[in-house]
Amino acid sequence: MNRRQLLRGSVAVSAAAVLPRAADAQSGTALTFSPSYVRELARALATKPFAAPDEKLPEALKNLNYDQYRSIRFAPEKALWRAEKLPFEVQFFHRGFFYKNRVDIFQVADRSVTPVSYRRDDFSFGEGLGQWPDADLGFAGFRIHAPINKPDYYDELCVFLGASYFRVVAKGQTYGLSARGLAIDTGESKGEEFPVFKAFWLEKPAPSASSMVVHALLDSKSAAASYRFTIRPGQTTVFDVEMALYPRVDLEHAGLAPMTSMFFFGPNDRKDFDDFRPAVHDSDGLSIFNGRGEQLWRPLNNPHDLQVSSFTDVNPGGFGLMQRERNYLAYQDLESSFETRPSLWFEPIGDWGEGAVKLFEIPTKEEVHDNIAALWQPKQPLTAKSEHIFTYRLHWGADAPRADALARFTRTGIGSRGDDSKLFVLELTGDRLKGVDPKTIKGVVTAEKADISNIVTQPNPATGGWRLSFQCSVKGQASIELRAFLAQNDAPVSEVWIYRWTP
């Protein structure tokens, strides 16, 4: 078992065992859906005592190993809306293995709510799984398919499976990092709380629809919430998210728009790794457009000890965990194809006030572990027994949706210059640097508690960009905060590179 599987499947979090009014739907009583339907369920759920999720399963399913669980497959021809040839269709995940929590799924058509029923015949089962009586087991999650690459083939577009995790791809991409509905107490000594999506409502799309709407009900010990996801696939897949949060207790460390990724090693951090591949990561950096108009780039690390970075802000412009390196030769992994992993950009809608972008870098010795997390944490606690509304967009694609007015950093390389110093070599690209007089470009580098020397800026004819290099004294330092950018006539012409060096 690894951390990625643990976080997405086996999180022992409680959720209310019974959905308000869900029993009516399952008994055949017609329910009418409205825009506030799930929001009212979340509001009501937050007023009730917290109850554990339904994990009841036959022993044969509860004790499945990884390979046995993977042998259970949903029949594609049974996909929801397949027969109607709609622009989206849905397949479902069986419960078992780490995915024991029951997730209720409903279809919304013409404002009428009907449950999506579990049918054993919709699945094929591998050999040696044992026997269990027929019963309504519900589902573990679902995935949406759409013709994003070819008009005649429905590719997997997104997956909702495990806790409040979901993964998404755009055209030509493969799964990489994940988003979550909500994070609570990430990085706190008392331990993190993992909310769960306990029910979904899938709006039936029109035959000509270019988007699909999914509603979700989230629950945890500390809060309940509703979500409305409007999913628009394409060259970049966009999620419009409307969230209504109802805390049961004051949330001092709420993580909004949380995202989770993996950084094993790269050109800036190859120590301790004997591997034929030059780099292994789902994301290589955190990009931030802050409320002061700065454009920041923070390369990721796989540190020896947990590292938490906080970037305070007011009304952020956006942030994201990005996979900037898109060249196969940078990875040379034929199976994982890290160059096709999506970047994920968070775009706030409206006034988000004071808070901080938080970055968590967790040590890992295996690439199967998700060890990177980023989120927005409001400065003020989210008060109990109140409604907190958040609206934002998530952009899954090759890059951030914002135009880069400034040159940006594309590679961070670090090498030793003896025991006392490190050589940093930073590559940049961007139209802002094309055709400029090299004599007018200056590298600006600062460091806390360390001396900087040999700052050199020069065009890089091999890339068509620029290179900034410098040396930094590191002797006796537990960590060093570094900051660098290129300037012309004292005005920035590049984003700001920020980095925490650790031994």
From Swiss-Prot:
Keyword GTP-binding listed: no
Biological pathway: Glycan metabolism; osmoregulated periplasmic glucan (OPG) biosynthesis
One record GO biological process: beta-glucan biosynthetic process
GO MF entries: carbohydrate binding; catalytic activity
HAMAP family: MdoG_OpgG
PANTHER family: GLUCANS BIOSYNTHESIS PROTEIN, GLUCANS BIOSYNTHESIS PROTEIN G
Name of the molecule in the record: Glucans biosynthesis protein G
Designated gene of the protein: opgG
